[in-house]
């Protein structure tokens, strides 16, 4: 008999993965944490029953949440990552030569520990001399730092449990205050197929605070619907108007200058909702 893990998206839809082995499981002070070795996607991080990342397709998410905003800013030096305890976002941020310091604030240190042990391909980001790790509340940390960062990346779990406040209007206002005059921020904003209303709410909240708001997307097989959105709030620079020659090349597997531009092209079913 085979072992299966099932992630329930709603009452009518679920995704199941055949599992080779349960590598790790624990209940932390904040959430249930598991690392599974799945047949289709290899080692997979699961928090509160929801797949966060896998070693097979993690590069898509981590490249798109980082390189799009980093290549939008003309000279990003200070970067804040809220969440991102697996280390993948930190790994990509530190590839940029202009970045002098990347601070990662993670509320659950057990996520970092498990990632270092079972997901070293991602957690190698913690080894960068540019990296600073703070164990604590990202909302509080942002509120305590005014005009400090060129880029804030909200690499959060879904809007449940400890991550609920990371999707709030008050938090977006706090991020605006934490950014320098040319700063911008990006957040993962869920599935266009299953969370359209949430995406629209987040977009409108951000557009009410920042001069520029843009939503873009990427194909990520392990996420529900395999299509995932990200939303940017920018004080000055438009991520959808970055000239190809301005996009800095890095060792990537998904992100390219062409993908950067194409990611802002909305399918009609989604574009119609933004009108």
UniProtKB/Swiss-Prot annotation:
<comment type="similarity">
    <text>Belongs to the spermidine/spermine synthase family.</text>
</comment>
<comment type="function">
    <text>Catalyzes the irreversible transfer of a propylamine group from the amino donor S-adenosylmethioninamine (decarboxy-AdoMet) to putrescine (1,4-diaminobutane) to yield spermidine.</text>
</comment>
<dbReference type="GO" id="GO:0005829">
    <property type="term" value="C:cytosol"/>
</dbReference>
<feature type="binding site">
    <location>
        <position position="106"/>
    </location>
    <ligand>
        <name>S-methyl-5'-thioadenosine</name>
    </ligand>
</feature>
<dbReference type="InterPro" id="IPR029063">
    <property type="entry name" value="SAM-dependent_MTases_sf"/>
</dbReference>
<dbReference type="GO" id="GO:0004766">
    <property type="term" value="F:spermidine synthase activity"/>
</dbReference>
<feature type="binding site">
    <location>
        <position position="31"/>
    </location>
    <ligand>
        <name>S-methyl-5'-thioadenosine</name>
    </ligand>
</feature>
<protein>
    <recommendedName>
        <fullName>Polyamine aminopropyltransferase</fullName>
        <ecNumber>2.5.1.16</ecNumber>
    </recommendedName>
</protein>
<dbReference type="InterPro" id="IPR035246">
    <property type="entry name" value="Spermidine_synt_N"/>
</dbReference>
<dbReference type="InterPro" id="IPR030373">
    <property type="entry name" value="PABS_CS"/>
</dbReference>
<feature type="binding site">
    <location>
        <begin position="137"/>
        <end position="138"/>
    </location>
    <ligand>
        <name>S-methyl-5'-thioadenosine</name>
    </ligand>
</feature>
<feature type="domain" description="PABS">
    <location>
        <begin position="2"/>
        <end position="235"/>
    </location>
</feature>
<dbReference type="GO" id="GO:0008295">
    <property type="term" value="P:spermidine biosynthetic process"/>
</dbReference>
<dbReference type="InterPro" id="IPR030374">
    <property type="entry name" value="PABS"/>
</dbReference>
<feature type="active site" description="Proton acceptor">
    <location>
        <position position="155"/>
    </location>
</feature>
<dbReference type="InterPro" id="IPR001045">
    <property type="entry name" value="Spermi_synthase"/>
</dbReference>
<dbReference type="InterPro" id="IPR037163">
    <property type="entry name" value="Spermidine_synt_N_sf"/>
</dbReference>
<feature type="binding site">
    <location>
        <begin position="155"/>
        <end position="158"/>
    </location>
    <ligand>
        <name>spermidine</name>
    </ligand>
</feature>
<feature type="binding site">
    <location>
        <position position="62"/>
    </location>
    <ligand>
        <name>spermidine</name>
    </ligand>
</feature>
<feature type="binding site">
    <location>
        <position position="86"/>
    </location>
    <ligand>
        <name>spermidine</name>
    </ligand>
</feature>
<dbReference type="Pfam" id="PF01564">
    <property type="entry name" value="Spermine_synth"/>
</dbReference>
<keyword id="KW-0620">Polyamine biosynthesis</keyword>
<comment type="subunit">
    <text>Homodimer or homotetramer.</text>
</comment>
<comment type="pathway">
    <text>Amine and polyamine biosynthesis; spermidine biosynthesis; spermidine from putrescine: step 1/1.</text>
</comment>
<keyword id="KW-0963">Cytoplasm</keyword>
<dbReference type="Pfam" id="PF17284">
    <property type="entry name" value="Spermine_synt_N"/>
</dbReference>
<feature type="binding site">
    <location>
        <position position="162"/>
    </location>
    <ligand>
        <name>S-methyl-5'-thioadenosine</name>
    </ligand>
</feature>
<keyword id="KW-0808">Transferase</keyword>
<keyword id="KW-0745">Spermidine biosynthesis</keyword>
């Amino acid at each position: 008999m085979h072992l299966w893990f099932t992630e329930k998206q709603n009452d009518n839809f679920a995704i199941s993965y055949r599992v080779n082995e349960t590598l790790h499981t624990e209940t932390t002070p904040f959430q249930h944490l598991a690392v599974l070795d799945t047949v289709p996607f290899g080692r997979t991080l699961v928090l509160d029953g929801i797949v966060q990342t896998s070693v097979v397709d993690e590069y898509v998410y981590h490249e798109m949440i980082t390189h799009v905003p980093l290549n939008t800013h003309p000279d990003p030096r200070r970067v804040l990552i809220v969440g991102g305890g697996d280390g993948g976002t930190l790994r990509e941020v530190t590839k940029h030569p202009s970045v002098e310091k990347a601070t990662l604030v993670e509320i659950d240190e057990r996520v970092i520990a498990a990632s270092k042990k079972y997901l070293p391909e991602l957690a190698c980001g913690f080894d960068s001399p540019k990296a600073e790790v703070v164990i604590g509340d990202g909302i509080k940390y942002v509120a305590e730092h005014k005009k400090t960062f060129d880029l804030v990346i909200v690499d959060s779990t879904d809007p449940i449990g400890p991550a609920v406040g990371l999707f709030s209007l008050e938090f977006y206002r706090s991020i605006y205050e934490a950014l320098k005059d040319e700063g911008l921020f990006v957040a993962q904003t869920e599935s266009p197929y299953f969370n359209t209303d949430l995406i629209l709410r987040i977009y409108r909240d951000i557009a009410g605070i920042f001069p520029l708001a843009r939503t873009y997307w990427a194909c990520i097989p392990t996420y529900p619907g395999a299509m995932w959105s990200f939303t940017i709030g920018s004080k000055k620079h438009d991520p959808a108007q970055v000239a190809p020659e301005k996009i800095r090349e890095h060792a990537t597997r998904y992100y390219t200058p062409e993908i950067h531009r194409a990611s802002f092209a909305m399918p009609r079913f989604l574009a119609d909702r933004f009108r």
